[in-house]
Amino acid sequence: MPNYFFVKLNPPRPTFPGDMTDEERDVMQAHGAYWTEMTRKGFVIVFGPVLEPNSTFGMGVFEAESEERVWELLADDPAKKAGLSHEVHPMRIGAVRGSI
């Protein structure tokens, strides 16, 4: 069975992305393009923003052989290069659509 990892992109401040600067907007566009490419390559199952009442954060689910591989892939994320931080959490999957 494949290994799955929940990845959270921590926002730089609680008001983000509502008050993004032009530079941050450029970074986030590049970030979205990077995650789209990771999805095309089969590493990412799903990704996008989570809209919390007091904050918004990014999330994605990776399929990879190890947590170390996820961190290697995240090193090239433009958001990471711009100084934003990620959290990586291993997941235990109850079921995946299409596999049951």
Predicted regions span which residues?
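Conserved, structured core segments of small domains
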Residues: 1-100
